């Protein structure tokens, strides 16, 4: 299987604070990579560099056939093209409150990609059905639960037809009872062959869905491999310590 995403030597600092140190990994097309690690380990920053929401200071990131060397000057057009390769789902769903669910989902395709409105609407209805919210198309975000809003956020990211889906702790802000609905949608996407990178605290979910797990600590990829290795027989003491604390908190 060819790699859809390759990350080579990514570095990132905020002021004096170095957040990512020489981060490199590959994500084969049609696979799911889970990124785990303690708070402040750089997980979210890694994800944000993949969408250039945070621009890496150096390193090369390739998505599909578009390769960007962040040590060089990157022009705006290239950066925009790079950003459109991936769809991002945040911890909080960031929906536009004054727009209906349907309007939220068609906004990107119509405004950014200049797609015909009727085509975007048909696509949006199909995506809302996929995330189990077809009947909520004309409601406003405040009328939905947090979990439903998050699923609209997923539909909105899918609407731009990205090559790669990025999830930043998509369930961390949700009521525990609603977590399952969102995870089910992500699992369905995995079964449909979407290529995804998911930052998550849901270790059991990572075990079920991920093909590869990266353990990040202090901005370094300390360990990576299939979930059955990283999550059940980690080689690094730090990975073991982290997993013990998460799986047996008391």
Please place each PLM-identified region on the residue numbering.
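ABC family nucleotide-binding domain
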Residues: 3-227
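C-terminal boundary and immediately downstream tail of ABC-type ATPase nucleotide-binding domains
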Residues: 228-250
């Amino acid at each position: 299987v060819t790699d859809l995403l390759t990350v080579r030597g990514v570095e990132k600092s905020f002021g004096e604070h170095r957040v990512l140190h020489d981060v490199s990994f590959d994500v084969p097309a049609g696979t799911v990579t889970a990124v785990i690690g303690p708070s402040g380990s750089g997980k979210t920053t890694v994800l944000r560099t993949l969408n250039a929401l945070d621009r890496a200071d150096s390193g090369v990131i390739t998505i599909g056939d578009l390769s960007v060397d962040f040590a060089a000057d990157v022009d705006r057009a290239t950066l925009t093209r790079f950003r459109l390769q991936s769809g991002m789902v945040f911890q909080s769903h960031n929906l536009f409150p004054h727009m209906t669910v349907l309007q939220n989902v068609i906004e990107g395709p119509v405004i950014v990609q200049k797609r015909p409105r009727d085509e975007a609407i048909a696509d949006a209805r199909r995506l809302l059905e996929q995330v189990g919210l077809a009947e909520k198309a004309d409601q406003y975000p405040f009328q939905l639960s947090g979990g439903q809003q998050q699923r609209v956020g997923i539909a909105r990211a899918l609407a731009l037809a990205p090559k790669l889906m990025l999830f930043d702790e998509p369930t961390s802000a949700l009521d525990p009872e609603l977590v399952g609905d969102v995870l089910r949608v992500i699992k369905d996407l995995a079964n449909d062959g979407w290529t995804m990178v998911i930052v998550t605290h849901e270790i059991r979910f990572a075990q079920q869905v991920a093909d590869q797990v990266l353990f990040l600590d202090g901005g370094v990829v300390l360990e990576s491999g299939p979930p059955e290795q990283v999550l059940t027989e980690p080689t690094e003491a730090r990975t073991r310590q982290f997993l013990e604390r998460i799986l047996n908190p008391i």
